[in-house]
């Protein structure tokens, strides 16, 4: 197995059915000045259902057992934002969304991969969206619902769309979003489980639980054809021809669509 950068400027579009993935803003982490100062911001990714459902019913709080699961699946019928970047990137985020024809009020679900300010600093732009931040899920208005997310117990949002517990970097409550069925195979939006492609020299120093994060990294690499890391361009996961294909993986050779070009859905 090896990895290689998926080249292209933001926004980078990977068409899919039933969900397409748009990397709106590529994260970065760059040394600044002397000492250990770093200027950084997290990647921001949009997951778009091919067919959008009505945007009203997800705002109502479901009753009874299975409420969180039903509410999550309902919220996933509209645009899903994975991380929001830091508050200093507010205008860049709004501009990137507008470039996709999405207003803040159109977003029905925001997933925060972990609780660091460079990843969830713009939650206030989306008061009408359901929020899944780390392991906390709430509906608009602050109604929190219990759910079964845990290591080895994913939350299903829709066909080929899941949230996984991927602990390590920020502690025990980090999550990743797994999108199967794209033109490039399975895309995993991994937050800071991966800082960037080729981060083997640095990720452990930034991890609250390196052992847990190592397990999370291995789990992601088993299924991913493309990884969207927290602070760098997306990268491909390339397997030897003799390796068995994993569920959702196809290692498609189709290239993503970059910039303002229209994706050709297949």
Curated annotation (Swiss-Prot):
It comes from the Eukaryota. Pfam families: Lactamase_B. It catalyses: a ribonucleotidyl-ribonucleotide-RNA + H2O = a 3'-end ribonucleotide-RNA + a 5'-end 5'-phospho-ribonucleoside-RNA + H(+). Zn(2+) 2 binds at residues 118-119, 192, 231. InterPro entries: MBLAC1, Metallo-B-lactamas, RibonucZ/Hydroxyglut_hydro. Residues 48-71, 229-266 are annotated as: Disordered. Changing residue 192 to A: Loss of endoribonuclease activity. Zn(2+) 1 binds at residues 114, 116, 169, 192. It is found in: Cytoplasm, Cytosol; Nucleus. GO terms for cellular component: cytoplasm; cytosol; nucleus. PANTHER family: METALLO-BETA-LACTAMASE DOMAIN-CONTAINING PROTEIN 1. This is Metallo-beta-lactamase domain-containing protein 1. It comes from Homo sapiens (Human). The gene is MBLAC1.
């Amino acid at each position: 197995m090896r990895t290689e950068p998926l080249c292209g400027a933001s926004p980078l579009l990977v068409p899919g059915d039933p969900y397409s993935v748009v990397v709106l803003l590529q994260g970065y982490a760059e040394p600044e000045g002397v000492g250990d100062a770093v200027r950084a911001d997290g990647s921001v990714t949009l997951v778009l259902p091919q067919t959008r459902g009505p945007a009203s019913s997800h705002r109502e709080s479901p009753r009874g057992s299975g409420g969180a699961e039903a509410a999550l699946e309902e919220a996933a019928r509209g645009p899903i934002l994975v991380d929001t970047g830091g508050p200093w990137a507010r205008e860049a985020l709004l501009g990137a969304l507008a470039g996709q024809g999405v207003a803040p009020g159109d977003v029905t679900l925001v997933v925060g991969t972990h609780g660091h300010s460079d990843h969830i600093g713009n939650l206030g732009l989306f008061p009408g969206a359901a929020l899944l931040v780390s392991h906390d899920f709430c509906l608009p208005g602050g109604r929190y619902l219990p759910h079964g997310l845990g290591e080895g117990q994913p939350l299903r949002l829709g066909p080929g769309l899941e949230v996984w517990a991927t602990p390590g970097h920020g502690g025990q409550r980090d999550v990743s979003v797994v999108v199967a069925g794209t033109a490039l195979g399975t895309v995993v939006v991994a937050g800071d489980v991966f800082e960037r492609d080729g981060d083997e020299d640095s990720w452990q120093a930034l991890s609250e639980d390196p052992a847990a994060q190592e397990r999370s990294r291995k789990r992601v690499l088993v299924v991913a054809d493309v990884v969207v890391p927290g602070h760098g361009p997306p990268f491909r996961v390339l397997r030897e021809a003799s390796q068995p294909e994993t569920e959702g993986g196809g290692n498609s050779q189709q290239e993503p669509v970059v910039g303002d070009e229209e994706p050709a859905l297949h």
